[in-house]
């Protein structure tokens, strides 16, 4: 069965582009780290997503590359990684901190020297700086005490922010599946079910229709928990009159888009309808600003002003959009301090969230920037008040 995915040739091109940027910044080697929960940067280069353990990708300025994993992931990584040089390293072991006394492991010295990088006074860039643990950084400094170690996240953002045709195809396939899950949950919603039961409906739908995993922990929240910007579903029983927030997602070859919308369990009360309508209006305002060449901070500042002009400053939490791709929330965000211009084939979640004292809501969809505006990656969001 054919499936939507990133071809092996694209992984090779990614490493080549990375090497070009490394040379511009005089880097001898780049170490790109990730975890099970935030795997995006190393998976971008090798296609491997760890569990329990961590993962690192080492790329030398000469183009050679290797994958570093915990001792239990060597065979797993060897089977799925597009980079076939696999090194077991204790820096990447699981949090239980086993010592694995019977297993021969490698150090950063072993890996970097095998890639052809000689000497101790080298310049090392770190990609996935926030995902780099103290254990990883301490190990690198111990192996290379004379090295200059710098944050190289700017390289990762530059590489990942403009999407290829294959990446956009993966994102759109994820949206197709997430839409099916959304429709199935809406069909199943009724007074008396729990939030977690509805998560089960969504999970069944995404796996039956081709997802490798959920793109984010499925959001099915009701009433007070809808005021949480991020949260987890619970055993709460959904009742008539509730507002229910859905944010459902599907991962396709790592790419993890999400669809978010509120659902009324009956007609909204005047208070709820007022905030639901304002949030949708803010969402549509954002869409009108999106096109190549626009300064991201101008959109974010205008978005905040839209809240203030409508007397809604107290409901504002964060800016209007964030990047999406090989993880649901990725750089760049659109914030009042953002100094970049929108470019064609940037992909964003238009993520419009408002929070009140007793409830909140989110309208969220995915788009790709074009020269004259944007293309939607999913169906138009529906205004839903269920009838019971």
Mark where each language-model region is.
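Active-site neighborhoods and metal-handling regions in enzymes and metal-associated proteins
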Residues: 1-388
């Amino acid at each position: 069965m054919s499936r939507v995915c990133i071809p092996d040739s694209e992984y090779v091109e990614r490493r080549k582009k990375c090497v070009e940027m490394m040379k511009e910044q005089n880097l001898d080697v780049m170490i790109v780290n990730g975890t099970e929960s935030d795997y995006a940067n190393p998976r971008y280069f090798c296609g491997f997503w760890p569990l329990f353990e961590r993962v690192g990708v080492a790329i030398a300025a000469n183009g050679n590359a290797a994958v570093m994993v915990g001792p239990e992931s060597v065979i797993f990584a060897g089977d799925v990684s597009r980079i076939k040089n696999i090194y077991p390293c204790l820096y990447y072991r699981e949090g239980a901190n086993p010592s694995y006394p019977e297993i021969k492991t490698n150090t950063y010295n072993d890996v970097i020297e095998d890639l052809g990088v000689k000497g101790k006074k080298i310049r090392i860039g770190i990609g996935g700086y926030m995902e780099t643990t103290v254990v990883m950084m301490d190990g690198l400094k111990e192996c290379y005490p004379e090295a200059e170690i710098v944050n190289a996240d700017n390289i990762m953002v530059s590489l990942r922010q403009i999407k290829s045709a294959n990446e956009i195809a993966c994102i759109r396939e994820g949206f197709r599946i997430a839409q099916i899950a959304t429709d199935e949950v809406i069909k199943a919603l009724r007074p008396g079910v729990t939030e977690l039961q509805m998560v089960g409906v969504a999970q069944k739908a995404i796996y039956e229709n081709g997802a490798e995993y959920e793109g984010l922990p499925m959001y099915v929240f009701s009433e007070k928990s809808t005021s949480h910007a991020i949260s987890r579903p619970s055993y709460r029983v959904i009742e008539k009159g509730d507002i229910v927030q859905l944010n459902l997602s599907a991962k396709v070859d790592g790419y993890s888009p999400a669809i978010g919308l509120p659902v009324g369990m009956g007609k909204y009360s005047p208070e709820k309808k007022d905030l639901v309508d304002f949030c949708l209006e803010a969402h549509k305002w954002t869409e009108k600003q999106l096109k190549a060449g626009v300064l991201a901070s101008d959109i974010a500042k205008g978005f905040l002003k839209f809240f203030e002009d409508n007397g809604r400053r107290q409901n504002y939490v964060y800016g209007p959009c964030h990047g999406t791709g090989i993880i649901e929330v990725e750089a760049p965000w659109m914030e009042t301090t953002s100094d970049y211009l929108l470019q064609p084939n940037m992909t964003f979640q238009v993520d419009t969230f408002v929070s009140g004292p007793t409830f909140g809501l989110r309208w969220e969809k995915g788009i790709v920037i074009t020269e004259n505006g944007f293309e939607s990656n999913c169906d138009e969001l529906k205004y839903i008040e269920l009838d019971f």
